[in-house]
Each structure stands twice: as C-alpha cells, then as structure tokens.
Design a protein with these regions (language model features):
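Basic, helix-initiating cap at the start of DNA-binding domains
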Residues: 2-60, 69, 73
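Solvent-exposed, amphipathic alpha-helical segments
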Residues: 48, 52-59, 102-110, 194-205
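Helix-turn-helix
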Residues: 56-90, 94
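Amphipathic alpha-helical segments used for helix-helix packing
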Residues: 132-152, 169, 197-203, 207
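Hydrophobic/aromatic-rich alpha-helical bundle segments in the mid-to-C-terminal region
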Residues: 141, 174-221, 228-237
Length: 237
C-alpha cells in the first residue's frame, strides 16, 4: 500500500516536471530537447536526479553540491545526467520550479471566507508560507540561502512572485470592494517584497524563519497595507 502511495507521489511530481519541459523558455535551461525524454526509464532517471539533489541539500550548502555529487547520490552515470540537465544549476532551477508549484497550491487552500477582515487572510497566508518551510527546510534554503545558484537574469523568480500576488489579489477582489485609487496589485507586490525581505534576513541569521521574524513580517505587511486600505473593507454583495 505504501509503495503504491509513493508511486502516486512520484507520478505527481513527474507530471509537474513534464509541465516544466513543455515550457519552452524554461526548457532551454533544463534540457537540450524538451520532447526527447518521455520514456519510463528517462522519467525515472530524471526523477532520481531531482530527488538526489533535494536529499543532498538537506545537509549541504546548495552551492557546494556538484553535478557529480548528485549523480553519485542518484546512482545515475554522469554522462547520462547531461541528457536531462546541462549543469547543477538546471537541477536546482527545476526543484525551485516544483517547489513554487507546491507552494502556490498550498496557499490557494487558504480560504478568505474563513476570516472576517483582510488582515486575517493576509496573516493566514504568511503563516501558511512559514508552515511550508517548517515542513520542508530545503524549500526555504533554495529561496533564501546565500549559497544558492545565481538565477538572476531569468524572469523565473519574478514570475513566481507575480503568481502569488495574483492569487492574493484575486481572493481579495472576490470578497471585498477594493479602493479605486492606486494600483492594488502594485501595493501587494511591495507587501510581498517586505515579507520576503524579512524572511531572508531571518533565514540568513538563523537558517530558519523564526517566530519572531514571522511576527515582524506580519506586522510590517499589515502596517504597509493599512496606509492604503481601510480597517474594514466593504464586502461584495
């Protein structure tokens, strides 16, 4: 039974990996030919490389992990690994993509109807984010650690940030009448940047998002938005 559950989890992750390969821009960073490896053997090897990198990142700084390390952990010949990922950065970029999908899916389960005011919903989103990092510290490491691969120059990180902001914006507009002045999405992006900055500070000081900095991020985010949003937004009828 447990083996079947594990197979289902692997299939789910691999489906997400297939989505990456369909994305033409991201695929250029991951594989030379995005349609090349669809066989069961190819999927299994790609999955082993991803999980090998993830396991190594539990105990080692990401920047210290080499492609050779991942191949050894995964039991995949290095020559074969190049068919799936051109370098170690591509493996961690793929993991970051998978993490982002999972984070978005979890945050989408936070229902705005469960909270009387927008402050409660925002607090729940922030707390749920930290809960994800508590459950899997490798996710926080890949986002906030100083020793992560340099992904600057691609729009991937920005795209993920925008998707989170879009999610929060959609939930707010579904429930509340938002002010017609200013750009609320831009306000939420600034809010996200405030939260992200405080989380980064916490992680780089303590290698985790501490309760203190979780509270600081929540206070700062709500305080900023209170400059533009009333305490009680009118609800849509």
């Amino acid at each position: 039974m447990s083996e079947q559950v594990n197979d289902n989890v692997d299939d789910k992750v691999d489906d997400k990996m297939e989505d990456i390969l369909v994305d033409s821009e991201l695929a250029k960073k991951l594989v030379p030919n995005k349609f090349k490896f669809t066989s069961q053997q190819g999927r299994a090897r790609r999955q082993k490389l991803l999980m090998g990198a993830k396991k190594l990142s539990e105990t080692k700084a990401i920047n210290d992990i080499t492609l050779a390390d991942v191949c050894e952990e995964a039991g995949i010949p290095r020559a074969s690994a190049y068919h799936f990922f051109p370098n170690i950065e591509a493996i961690f970029l793929a993991l970051r993509f998978l993490n982002a999908i999972e984070i978005l899916e979890i945050l989408a389960t936070v229902e705005i109807e469960d909270y009387d005011r927008w402050q409660g919903y925002l607090t729940a989103i922030i707390e749920r984010s930290v809960g994800i990092f508590y459950d899997d510290s490798t996710k926080a490491k890949l986002i906030y650690d100083t020793n992560t691969p340099d992904f600057e120059g691609d729009s991937f990180g920005e795209d993920i940030d925008l998707q989170i902001v879009e999610l929060v914006y959609e939930r707010l507009t579904q429930r509340y009448e938002l002010p017609n002045f200013g750009d609320v999405k831009d306000m939420l992006m600034v809010t996200f940047s405030i939260i992200n900055g405080i989380f980064t500070l916490s992680y780089r000081r303590y290698e985790e998002i501490t309760d203190k900095y979780l509270q600081e991020a929540t206070i700062a985010a709500i305080a900023y938005l209170r400059c533009y949003l009333p305490e009680n937004l009118p609800r849509k009828k």
